[in-house]
Amino acid sequence: MKKLQRIFITISFLFLFVNKGLTANENFYDKIDLFSEVLNKINKEYVDEIDQNKVMDSAINGVLQSLDPYSAYMSPEMFNSMQTETSGKFGGLGIEVGMEAGVVKVISPIDNSPASEVGVKAGDYIVKVNNIQVQGKSLTEAVDLMRGPVGSDIEITIRRRGIKKALIFKITRKVIEVQSVKSKTIDNKVGYIRLTSFNENSSAQIKGEIIEINKNKKIKGFILDLRNNPGGLLSQAIKISDFFLDSGEIVSTKSRKKSENRKWFARKGDVIKGKPLIVLTNYGSASASEIVAGALKDHKRAIIIGENSYGKGSVQSIIPLKNNGAIRLTISKYYLPSGKSISEVGVTPDIEISEANEDFKMNTKTDNQLNFAIKLLNG
């Protein structure tokens, strides 16, 4: 326990020192004094031997998660795993998750991933992992439970709105390869582009696909499918929005410091030359997806079809720490050209079409949202 005792002594000494002359923050430092006292009591009187690292990690994570659902602490192991996942190939279930009121919530399943193949949907709540309750655990702890070797099985219990009975899915972990851009021509008249995430190559790939589709002189219009796209790089959302606009504001961000507030504007040059554009969204469309859909809607450049988007209107920065871990911290909020915030509200479709039924599967005969968009463009 000597290591933990040194932590208590350091905390107490540090905040006794900085407390002098800081009357405006007295209550804040009193709370830290209280925190130190509580840790000391745990150290001396708790019934079992405690895992010192786990206690401190949970305390740090608790501070961050009290700010919003997206700020969190990542241990060195978690940070390393995150860096592996952003390389575009990793082992797992293939879901993007967040926290809502202490419950793990699916933001979106990745296309063709083990989770999407068994029927996990955006908006589902994960309540158990291998029969272990995850409610009350941190997001980091819940994600750790879901990790495992490629080829191993996992059972997750889900609650879904509108369904009384819990749903249980058995999933085999696989290597997840993220292909962010897919395209095709439908009925020789409609250019269809599916974007699953906003990574560093997305804008260049989309522009290349548009150029290729435009070689067909019979193309009447385009569909940009952002369903189940949890977001990604802000820079890519701006570039992709700019492809379809000739002028005007795309998005703005507001930070704690006014000097860091920013606005981005479109440059002249619509790559589809004014042809009709439809954007498909659903509850799994979040963050960067909402920037694109919101900007194109506000400028009346596209018709938004599908369901209301997720409502994640904030920017997170990954800040490395000395222990080789990191914190994910919200540093600013997005605002659409209309001045509206995306946070919690999301982007409302111009034409609302819900997923038809349990047989609904994107980009198939049961995809009523895509089918409606195709009919609209074909006239």
What is the role of each PLM region?
Residues 58, 70-108:
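PDZ/PDZ-like peptide-tail recognition elements
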Residues 9-20:
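Bacterial N-terminal signal peptides
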Residues 1-8:
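Bacterial N-terminal signal peptides that target proteins for export
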Residues 2, 303-304, 377:
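Cysteine endopeptidase catalytic domains of the caspase/legumain-like
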Residues 341-379:
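Conserved functional hotspot residues or short segments at active or partner-binding sites
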Residues 21-31, 35, 39-52, 105-108, ...:
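Cleft-lining beta-strand/loop regions that shape enzyme active-site pockets
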Residues 50-68, 239:
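An acidic helix/loop motif centered on a single conserved Asp/Glu
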Residues 316-320, 327-356:
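Conserved P-loop NTPase
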